[in-house]
Regions:
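Conserved glycine-rich cofactor-binding loop
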Residues: 15-16
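Short C-terminal tail/terminal secondary-structure segment
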Residues: 96, 213, 231, 238, ...
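Substrate-binding pocket helix/loop in short-chain dehydrogenase/reductase
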Residues: 96-99, 103-108, 211
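Active-site helix of classical SDR
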Residues: 122, 164
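Alpha-helical segment proximal to the catalytic Tyr-Lys
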Residues: 127, 176-178, 239
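Residue(s) in the substrate-gating loop at a strand-loop-helix junction
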Residues: 148
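Short, small/polar-rich loop/turn modules that mediate ligand/substrate recognition or access, typified
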Residues: 180, 185, 241-243
Length: 257
């Protein structure tokens, strides 16, 4: 595919496990990618180079309005349009605390990125997408939010994370409703237990739970499992699908006796 035919995808949290794999998958399937993360550009130069010439890196914090604006401006300046937005960036509380000990500072930190930052970046991207021509399927762009099984599963040692992801599910529904007539499908993916840096600190706990049968498929999920799902929601494969939550968790959500 020539550069002039490539579609542009914006990916947040691009230097993390799911974000990086998502960028690789989109790049391998005809997209150019503009990605953002909090890592300084010189500190992730090797990883950025691994993604190739069709990748542009923007260092920034999703919680900051100016950084969100810079990300969108970079994508428009370099590619003239945004065909897909993949909201991957997310943080867990820096310290896991019982719900009765959770601090407002921790709550604000998690919500500021996971929910507020994603909501307002999506607003910026949607405003741009609305100005674009419809594709052969009648759509102007695609938006995918990476939520979590924690959106519907209680974990009282990280309540702020659960609330942030439950809120993100409503963000998905709101934008799906508002943008449907504009030809912009908005969906979310709810990963289960995925092998990333975020879960590495509790690997022993989840190894034990998986061995005991928590996940019917009997294994950890991988970032590639999520990236493939993202692609199907960005490339027109599911062009008539919006407001949906795609659960990718090896069956963990199934109620069993």
């Amino acid at each position: 595919m020539s550069d002039s035919c490539k579609k542009c995808a914006v990916v947040t949290g691009v230097m993390g496990g799911i974000g990086f794999e998502t960028a690789k998958t989109l790049l391998a399937n005809g997209f150019s990618v503009v990605g953002m993360d909090v890592v300084a550009a010189d500190a992730c130069a090797d990883k950025a180079a691994e993604l190739g010439a069709d990748f542009t890196y923007v260092s920034g914090n999703l919680a900051e309005g100016a950084d969100r604006e810079a990300l969108i401006a970079t994508a428009i300046r370099e590619h003239g349009a945004i065909h897909a937005l993949v909201n991957v960036a997310g943080v867990a509380p820096k310290v896991r605390r019982d719900l009765l000990e959770m601090t407002e500072e921790s709550y604000d930190f998690v919500m500021g990125i996971n929910t507020r930052g994603t909501m307002f970046l999506t607003q910026l991207a949607a405003r741009q997408m609305i100005t674009q021509e419809r594709d052969e399927l009648g759509n102007r762009g695609y938006i995918v939010n990476i939520s979590s099984c924690s959106a519907y599963t209680s974990s009282t040692s990280r309540g702020e994370y659960c609330v942030s992801k439950a809120g993100l599910s409503m963000v998905t529904m709101l934008y799906a409703d508002r943008l449907a007539a504009e030809g912009i499908p908005v969906n979310e993916i709810c990963p289960g237990i995925i092998a990333t840096g975020m879960t590495a600190v509790v690997k022993e706990k989840y190894d034990k739970l998986i061995a005991e049968g928590l996940v019917p498929e009997g294994r950890w999920g991988f970032p590639s499992d999520i990236a493939k799902a993202v692609l199907s929601l960005c490339d027109g494969t599911l062009a008539y699908t919006t407001g949906q939550s795609l659960i990718v968790d090896g069956g963990m959500h199934i109620r069993r006796l």
